Amino acid sequence: MRWSVVLHLVLAVVAVGAGVHSAVFAWRSPDAARTRRLAGWALAASLAAYVVGALIYPAYKVEIRVAWLEQAHPEATRAFDLKEQFVALALPMQLALWWLLRARAARPALARGLALATAALLVTAALLAAGVETVHGHP
């Protein structure tokens, strides 16, 4: 399970980094191609992290969450669930942003708003994940 957790982490870091950079470029640069490319990387990394996370979730639920996290640190369990909800909100927004930029629609304000909201959700999810990780770690 350890390699898949590391892969999940690396993909999440790429997703957050690309998401934040796409938001920065959406606000500061008229270069839609770069923003579109970064938004595509963020979407691809988020989807890959989601798939890897879904594959490791059953083991996490049995070995960590039910085994002791829910009893010892219920606040960490709630933070994990909140992180998952933020990611679930960010994914369709990332897809919409990528599609909007890909279609080259003349809606820069919408693209900027989507990029910023998506980046905020991804960063918040990453901070929640880091908080949960400090509570339980991995054996």
Task: Outline where the language-model segments fall.
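Polytopic transmembrane helical bundles with strong interfacial aromatic enrichment
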Residues: 1-139
